[in-house]
């Protein structure tokens, strides 16, 4: 029986496409790279940060990451907007007694949840700086399970990318794949999704709330 719901943030709970586009173009202007469009960003939303940059700009430099974390993220964080019904789903899940968590490749997820006004719903949140290895390695989800004292069999992870599905599979957790970014149902299923839905709003049957 599922009693723990774990969520990715980007393109799962929130539409962060504009935030990513603005952030990418801040990077482009600062480092003399090609500026990108919304369509460019949509095509790489489900990649890791390194893959995101390598696809857009053909490379990865350590100084980019430092600038991204310390300059870009604080300035674009407010541009992410909750998807319709996302907060209602969190509220409903909490009332039904579910434990709620976040596992994201963002750093400092509690700060993001606070900006979005939804930190109050979550029992724990784990980001890329809290574990040795980011997704698709299972470290984040295993950390969530350990912190909450729950078994993998009682948890479900919701995300929008094959990366999320592989992370869940590696942790032995069932997963819900959402086609809210650029991943197709086939891509999510091939990566191990237990169920696929177009959005959180259409996934209440899977979530149980």
Which residues make up each language-model segment?
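Short acidic capping loops at alpha-helix termini that bridge into adjacent secondary structure
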Residues: 35-40, 120-124, 152-156
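Acidic, Mg2+-coordinating phosphoryl-transfer loop and its flanking beta/alpha structural elements
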Residues: 156-195
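Short amphipathic alpha-helical segments
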Residues: 18-19, 113-116, 169-171, 189-190, ...
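Substrate-recognition/cap helix-loop segment adjacent to the acidic, metal-dependent catalytic center
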Residues: 29-31, 53-59, 79, 87-101, ...
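Conserved Lys-Pro-Asp/Glu-containing loop-to-beta segment of HAD-superfamily phosphomonoesterases
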Residues: 2-4, 136-165
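N-terminal helical cap/lid subdomain that shapes the substrate entry/recognition surface
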Residues: 2-98
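Structural recognition of alpha->loop->beta junctions
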Residues: 118-128, 187-207
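Conserved SAM-binding loop
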Residues: 13, 102, 133, 157-158, ...
């Amino acid at each position: 029986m599922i009693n723990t719901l774990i969520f990715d943030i980007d393109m799962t709970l929130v539409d962060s496409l504009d935030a990513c586009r603005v952030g990418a173009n801040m990077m482009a202007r600062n480092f003399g790279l090609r500026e990108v469009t919304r369509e460019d960003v949509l095509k790489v939303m489900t990649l890791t940060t390194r893959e995101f940059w390598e696809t857009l700009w053909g490379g990865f430099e350590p100084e980019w990451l430092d600038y991204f974390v310390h300059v870009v993220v604080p300035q674009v964080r407010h541009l992410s907007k909750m998807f319709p019904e996302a907060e209602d789903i969190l509220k409903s899940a909490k009332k039904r007694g579910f434990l709620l968590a976040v596992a994201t490749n963002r750093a400092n997820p509690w700060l993001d949840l606070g900006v979005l006004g939804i930190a109050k719903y979550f029992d724990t949140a784990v980001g890329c700086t809290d574990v040795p290895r980011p997704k698709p390695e299972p470290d984040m989800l295993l950390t969530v399970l350990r912190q909450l004292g729950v078994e993998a069999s009682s948890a479900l992870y919701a995300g929008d990318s094959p990366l999320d599905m592989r992370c869940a599979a590696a942790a032995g957790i069932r997963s819900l794949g959402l086609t809210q970014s650029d991943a197709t149902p086939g891509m999510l299923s091939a990566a191990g999704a237990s169920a696929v839905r177009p959005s959180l709003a259409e996934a209440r049957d899977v979530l149980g709330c």
